[in-house]
Curated annotation (Swiss-Prot):
It comes from Arabidopsis thaliana. It is a multi-pass membrane protein. The chain crosses the membrane at residues 812-832, 846-866, 954-974. This is Multiple C2 domain and transmembrane region protein 7. SMART domains: C2. Ca(2+) 1 binds at residues 294, 300, 347, 349. One of its GO terms (cellular component) is vesicle.
Length: 1011
């Protein structure tokens, strides 16, 4: 057997800020690499704490199937030439799950790790680790030694022998965004080696590869839905808008209290979050030797599949006796009223289609097939005429009964999603379910430094030049700079958003502002993005000079006279250490950086079952009655899912299940319901019906949440309930320790804190990211249109709304309500409203003053007990949109009209003037509050500023006296006296302000300096 060509490449770039080990403040550093029993080492860099190697090494991978379980270890040492010994400088360990292909690899600087408790290490090691399968590359074992740098005491690279009796299979690296595909369970055509690998590591992947099995389901009446109310009275809302807990019968059994009651303990199913639905599948593959039907000597065949009143039609071919369709039709068994399936071959004609032949099946004899059973092999069937006699021509078909777990489900034509009038392939395409993968987004940073040897068209004046950078439809410009020496300096940064694969070019144009409104192009350069360097941290990118090309052809003699060409100095890189925000930061579903090597292992699996919808409002009129053609869209991370469109149905049943990998619990799943606008006239927009958000950190792991979610939408006339969506959600944890560790990590990648963006930059980049995702998903089939992407991504969440401002104010008041309640309680204590309570507080206060070491233990013990007590009343349901918190119940109609106004406004001037005056009134109150806060702060500053010499003198003298008193008097006595004085009896109080308050209010502020 031949060995696999798969190799692990390691580029040792350099190290930074190493620990000195030679006693003279330096180190003789080198690096040893260990992987899969192989060992390589770099050259020795003498007397250098920041060595640079730029050396590449390649390791043979003996068994690619075990790649994820191997580790790469890089150990740095300092060589002592006097003793032929070595000192440990630090190590870096990388797991096999972080290895990526060469195209995705970037240079990462890893902090040095200790080998033991007493190891003294510091600094970073720069590595670039990747996987390649180029056969021309050889292992570095034979060529890695450097005789001039090796010392006899140092070990050389070891040659590793590989057994040739073991079969090696090449494995493509898995894409984490594709490990859980919608409704495509593993078929029997997978390689035996992969099956063996799954068997060997079943305990690590039991969440990913469950088995399919058919089990019977009783049609018992479902339990009545149970209303779920919030535990807070302040956030209570109408019962019609509340969440309803349900106990449906799903594929795995009945759900009661978030747990599944299995009827058959041995029965398991991947699709256990939806009701099992049975379909009659008909795969029309091809036909042969069809009889001639036209006078032209040919036939224009198409196939019509009929079950009772349901009919599916394939596309037709012109003049072909051996057509191939390979189309699948799915008929919902619960709606079938016939017992016979007819597959009819017809000849397309202008007036009336001609009858060619048919094949008839008894549905009771159709076999049942559920994955992981092998796909049913199609067979040839002889056509019959209307009399039942065999005729010339055969049709290849496969007919079986399956569930929504079948591989053919997503691409099939569905009877419950069929148009009553138009059943063309184009219409059928926009009705199917689909899984989309959004492109991986990157930030492109362009640093425009300077330009030299600029040659303007008018040499009688100094050019006033600026640089225009363009990437797709994103355009940015530098400030104008007057080039007095035929050179200009800007040193400005631009940021763009780009999606993989990098097909666009970065275009930089140097333009001369000849006159106001008139610019002339001086030079231009094109930079392909696939040649731009990627970086995952903030290390410096080397700047490069790029030649500027003239936009027009000039005189050849002039080109010969010009000795130098125009150049521009740029620093361009792809930022992989950031997460490109393409959705609202409050509802982010993915927080991973762009660079794949920085991704951590998934901590869990999110499963979503979209069951059905009830009580939907009609969104259109068809044949004189209201109806809807609805579908659902789910978004989490880079994976978008779309259910099939249920045509002409106000209570549709979807029963489709989807799965996502979870990398961070502080993320949000978003599910939207839409009305398909592509079934009528072209150019119609898909209409939004409602949206649901579920934050994963609020879910208990392993629990199945089955609820009916109200679809609440805010209209210009007020909040409306558009129906209810019944869903089942389960969050399964793979590694509980990793999930808890995730709570200690920053929410966003490191670069967001090292080199943060401004708020304006974030809004602009987010807008560009949404446009890129919408353009990419809009090219899929069926497309996810732009209005869907914008609605799911909350692109308008930053726009002004009086309703949202009120809601945020009351939210803030709710947050501080506890502090206000404590202040009110303490005021009652000080006023001796309840003497017994006040005396007890005095005793407790005296105990804490005498024993201050009990303050922190008492406080934390109190919070511990309160937390245990509240566990009994913990929420048992996912949070949902609350109309009372959103201030959507009693909102003024004019405020709603303002919220739905476009940007810029399209309302009449009188309405805009009225709203402007109202906004001025609100802003005036805010201005007053901010001014009062500033005044209090300036009075504190005036205590020691001698702005009021008498007040400052009094304060300084009091501070000196207080210092003497606090030095002489024990602090317990001072605190006790202050506490007793604060809680003194009302008989010893008066209503006038105290002396310190009077003194503070007399201090000057800068209000006198305001215009």
């Amino acid at each position: 057997m031949m060995m696999s060509n798969l190799k692990l490449g390691v580029d040792v770039i350099g190290a930074h800020n190493l620990f000195p080990k030679d006693g003279q403040g330096t180190s003789n550093a080198y690096v040893e690499l260990y992987f899969d029993g192989q060992k390589h080492r770099t050259t020795i860099k003498d007397r250098d704490l920041n060595p640079v190697w730029n050396e590449s090494f390649f390791f043979n991978i003996s068994d690619p199937s075990r790649l994820h379980y191997l580790n790469l270890e890089a150990q740095a040492y300092s060589h002592n030439r006097s003793t032929n010994g070595r000192s440990f400088l630090g190590k870096v360990s990388l797991s096999g799950t972080s290895f990526v292909p060469h195209s995705d690899a970037v240079v990462l600087h890893f902090p040095m790790e200790r080998r033991g408790i007493f190891s003294r290490v510091r600094g970073e090691l720069g590595l670039k680790v990747y996987i390649t399968d180029e056969a021309s590359l050889k292992s570095s074992a034979a060529s890695n030694d450097h005789p001039d740098n090796l010392d006899p005491a140092l070990p050389r690279a070891m040659n590793v022998e590989h057994r040739s009796d073991k079969r090696h299979v090449f494995y493509n690296l898995p894409n984490s965004a594709q490990e859980h595909q919608h409704q495509h369970p593993q078929g029997p055509n997978q390689s035996s080696s992969l099956a063996a690998e799954q068997d060997n590591h079943n305990e690590h992947h039991h969440h990913y590869v469950p088995k399919h099995q058919v089990d019977e389901m009783r049609s018992e009446p479902a339990r009545p839905s149970k209303l779920v109310h919030a535990h807070s009275i302040a956030s209570a809302q109408p019962a019609d808008f509340a969440l309803k807990e349900t106990s449906p019968h799903l594929g795995g059994g009945r759900v009661v209290g978030g747990r599944v009651i299995h009827k058959d303990k041995t029965a398991t199913s991947t699709y256990d979050l939806v009701e099992r639905m049975y379909f009659l599948y008909v795969r029309v593959v091809k036909a042969r030797e069809l009889p001639i039907m036209d006078i032209t000597g040919s036939v224009d065949p198409f196939v019509e599949v009929r079950v009772g009143n349901y009919k599916g039609i394939t596309r037709h071919f012109e003049k072909r006796q051996h057509p191939e369709w390979n189309q699948v039709f799915a008929f919902a068994k619960e709606r079938m009223q016939a017992s016979v399936l007819e597959v009819v071959v017809k000849d397309k004609d202008l007036l009336k289609d001609d009858y060619v032949g048919f094949v008839r099946f008894d549905i009771n004899d159709v076999p049942l097939r559920v994955p992981p059973d092998s796909p049913l092999a199609p067979q040839w069937y002889r056509l019959e005429d209307k009399k039942g006699e065999k005729i010339k021509g055969e049709l290849m078909l496969a007919v079986w009964i399956g569930t929504q777990a079948d591989e053919a489900f997503s691409d099939a034509w569905h009877s419950d999603a069929a148009m009553p009038v138009d059943c063309s392939p184009a219409i059928s395409a926009v009705l199917r379910s689909k899984v989309y993968h959004a492109p991986r987004l990157w930030y492109v940073r362009v640093n425009v430094i300077e330009a030299q040897d600029l040659i303007p068209t008018d040499k009688t004046r100094f050019p006033d030049v600026y640089v225009k950078a363009q990437l797709g439809n994103q355009v940015m410009k530098t400030r104008p700079c007057q080039a007095r020496t035929l050179g200009a300096v800007w040193n400005e940064d631009f940021l763009f958003v780009v999606a993989e694969p990098f097909e666009d070019h970065l275009v930089l144009t140097v333009e001369d502002r000849v006159a106001p409104g008139k610019d002339e192009i001086v030079g231009r350069t094109y930079i392909p993005l696939n040649t731009v360097e990627k970086r995952a941290d903030d290390h410096m990118i080397h700047a490069r000079w790029y030649n500027l090309e003239r936009p027009v052809i000039v005189d050849v003699d002039q080109l010969k006279r010009e000795k130098f060409s125009m150049r521009i100095h740029l620093r361009v890189c792809l930022e992989g250490g950031y997460h490109v925000l393409d959705e609202s930061t409050h509802y982010s579903s993915d927080l991973r950086p762009s660079a794949r090597p920085l991704w951590r292992q998934p901590i869990g699996v999110l499963e979503l079952g979209i069951l059905n919808a009830v009580g939907l409002h009609p969104m259109k009129t068809r044949e004189g009655r209201g109806t809807s053609d609805t579908f659902c869209v789910g978004k989490y991370g880079q994976k978008w899912v779309r259910t099939r469109t249920m045509v002409d149905n106000l209570c549709p049943k979807y029963n489709e299940q989807y799965t996502w990998e979870v990398f961070d619990p502080a993320t949000v799943l978003t599910v939207g319901v839409f009305d398909n606008g592509q079934l009528g006239e072209k150019g119609n927009r898909d209409v939004k019906i409602g949206k649901i958000r579920i934050r994963l950190s609020t879910l208990e792991t392993g629990r199945i949440y089955t609820h009916s979610y109200p679809l609440l939408v805010l209209h210009p006339t007020g909040v409306k309930k558009m129906g209810e969506l019944h869903m089942a959600v389960r969050f399964t944890c793979i590694s509980f320790a990793n999930m808890l560790y995730q709570y200690s990590k920053p929410l966003l990648p490191k670069m967001h804190y090292v080199r943060p963006f401004s708020v304006m930059q974030q809004d602009m980049l987010r807008h560009q990211a949404v446009n890129i995702v919408a353009a990419r998903l809009g090219r899929a089939e069926p497309p996810l249109r732009k209005e869907i992407i914008e609605f799911m991504s909350d692109t308008d969440s930053h726009l002004w709304s009086m309703r949202k401002s009120k809601a945020n104010f009351f939210r803030m008041m709710t947050v501080f309500s506890g502090v206000i309640a404590v202040g009110k309680w303490f005021s009652d204590i000080c006023s001796w409203r309840n003497p017994i309570t006040t005396v007890l507080v005095h005793v407790l206060f005296l105990m804490l003053v005498c024993l201050p070491e009990l303050i922190l233990p008492t406080m934390f013990l109190y919070m511990f007990l309160i937390g245990l007590w509240n566990y009994r009343f913990r929420p048992r349901y996912p949070p949902h949109m609350n109309t009372k918190i959103s201030q959507a119940e009693a909102v003024h109609p004019d405020e709603l009209d303002e919220e739905f106004d476009t940007f810029p406004t399209t309302r009449n001037p009188d309405m805009v003037r009225l709203r402007y005056d109202r906004l001025r009134s609100v802003a005036g109150r805010i201005q007053t509050v901010i001014g009062d806060l500033a005044t209090q702060g300036e009075r504190f500053q005036a205590l020691l500023s001698w702005r009021d010499p008498r007040a400052t003198a009094i304060f300084v003298i009091l501070c000196f006296i207080a210092a003497i008193v606090f030095f002489i008097t024990p602090i317990q006595i001072v605190v006790a006296l202050a506490g007793f004085f604060t809680m003194r009896h009302p008989r010893f109080r008066h209503r006038l302000p105290s002396v310190p308050v009077n003194f503070f209010r007399r201090l000057p502020a800068r209000t006198d300096s305001m215009l």
